[in-house]
Amino acid sequence: MILLQSHSRFLLQTLLTRAQNLDKAVELDYQWIEFDDVRYHVQVTMKNPNLLLLSVSLPNPPPEAMSFDGLPLGAIEAIKTTYGTGFQILDPPRDGFSLTLKLNFSKVRPDEELLTKLASIREVVMGAPLKIIFKHLASRTVAPELDRLVAIMHRPNETFFLVPQADKVTVAFPMRFKDSVDTILATSFLKEFVEARRAAALNTAPSCSWSPTAPQELEGAPKETLSANAGFVTFVIFPRHVEGKKLDRTVWNLSTFHAYVSYHVKFSEGFMHTRMRRRVESMIQALDQAKPLEKTRSMNNKSFKRLGLNEVNHTNSK
């Protein structure tokens, strides 16, 4: 299984390149989109080469998701905690974006560790609500401001759900796919995923289950959020899964779970297409090799017609 990296590789490379060439006044203006419709924009001007603006656009949160000014609950506090005073949050952000950070290279030492953190801005922002819930779980409490059923946005117009309790947090994903082939492959993949969890080597991993219908924990969720053509996956997270360094890994793996499944579905589909092409090519080669043999056999197995005496004389006269 391949896990997605928490930092944007292109963003990290852009930041490292800029940090290594601060003595050069170079103008940058890069925009790109990564999985689940998260858009980035990096700007550096010739006028202020030590200032870098990083803007991030997140998908619009659906009504049931916890959000504040277009950002997940706790995102601003998470940014301040992660990056400290070396970064400035612009209010309002650049037009068309959910968040804009200003980095002054003359005031911040741009080492690789710091830039890797900045390249992980997606994890910091979108994982903020999960961290709030899981930090309370680690202390075996429940945040008083949370509802019994918490919805968190993770894809455009889609949410997954958490049921926080003092001793555990139940996480449920409605799995939706637009393509019918993707739906079939995802359903098969998820069943195998759940089956693999039963292996002895994974005894300490969070328990998980798959069902074609919504689990009981999602009772009370809006009906439109429970349409899942690939079923529902449920994880149960205990305090031991969010202790110490495990917290960040658990938050990232859950917030990108649908993307993780989608990646493996597309990879499997591509692998099957490759196998099919190879089989077709091998069949074509076999047919091509059979053609000369058929010609040889037809030459060796010619049938001769017996001619009459008059026909022989007529043939010889020609």
From Swiss-Prot:
Disordered: region residues: 297-318
Record's keyword annotation contains tRNA processing: no
Subcellular location: Cytoplasm, Cytoskeleton; Cell projection
Name of a matching Pfam family: P34-Arc
Protein origin, superkingdom: Eukaryota
Subunit structure comment from the entry: Component of the Arp2/3 complex composed of ARP2, ARP3, ARPC1/p41-ARC, ARPC2/p34-ARC, ARPC3/p21-ARC, ARPC4/p20-ARC and ARPC5/p16-ARC. Interacts with ARPC4.
Family per record: Belongs to the ARPC2 family.
PANTHER family: ACTIN-RELATED PROTEIN 2_3 COMPLEX SUBUNIT 2, ARP2/3 COMPLEX 34 KDA SUBUNIT
Record-given protein name: Actin-related protein 2/3 complex subunit 2A
Upper lineage: Eukaryota, Viridiplantae, Streptophyta, Embryophyta, Tracheophyta
Gene expressing this chain: ARPC2A
